[in-house]
């Protein structure tokens, strides 16, 4: 879908969350890639953190960012697989008010084009919590690239037509 260059680009504030038991700041290649994508697209990197694969820790961090009026969107990397320690989708589900099922569906479709049937092991997901977008991507740099380039780059661009997530932001808190 096209970017309408006659429309004004509206940058948003995005927090990047890396979920990993094994990665520290020095080894966070997926988080680094995601932060670079956010900035390169013209958005503001509002915050960044690395947390352990723990439902309570993840959901607590998400809730703090959702409560922060300076954060419009959270994108995480890691913890979306099938192992016992992969708890990101459960943590996100505790926080969001509404799920965005099409995000995970489209992510897996895009992943299929890159990694074939291995895409069935991904539980990438998204939702909205109190007006803040929450997106959970797998932990590999390739998956981050697929999710950003294939979905988030355009959906977080206010010029994308026929619609985008940014233009919905003022209406997310409607009752």
Predicted features, each with a name:
Residues 1-175:
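Non-catalytic beta/alpha edge segments that cap or flank active sites
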């Amino acid at each position: 879908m096209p970017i309408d260059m006659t429309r004004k680009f509206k940058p948003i504030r995005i927090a990047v969350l890396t979920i990993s038991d094994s990665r520290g700041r020095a080894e966070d290649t997926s988080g680094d890639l995601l932060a670079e994508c956010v900035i390169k697209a013209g958005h503001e990197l509002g915050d960044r953190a690395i947390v352990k694969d723990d439902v309570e820790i993840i959901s607590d961090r998400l809730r703090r960012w959702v409560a922060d009026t300076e954060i419009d969107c959270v994108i995480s990397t890691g913890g979306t697989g099938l192992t016992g320690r992969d708890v990101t989708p459960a943590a996100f589900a505790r926080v969001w008010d509404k799920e965005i099922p099409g995000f995970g569906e489209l992510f897996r479709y895009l992943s299929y084009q890159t990694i074939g049937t291995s895409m069935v092991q991904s539980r990438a997901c998204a939702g909205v919590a109190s007006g803040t977008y929450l997106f959970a991507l797998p932990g590999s740099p390739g998956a981050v690239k697929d999710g950003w380039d294939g979905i988030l780059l355009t959906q977080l661009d206010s010029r994308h037509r026929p619609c985008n997530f940014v233009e919905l932001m003022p209406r997310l808190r409607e009752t």
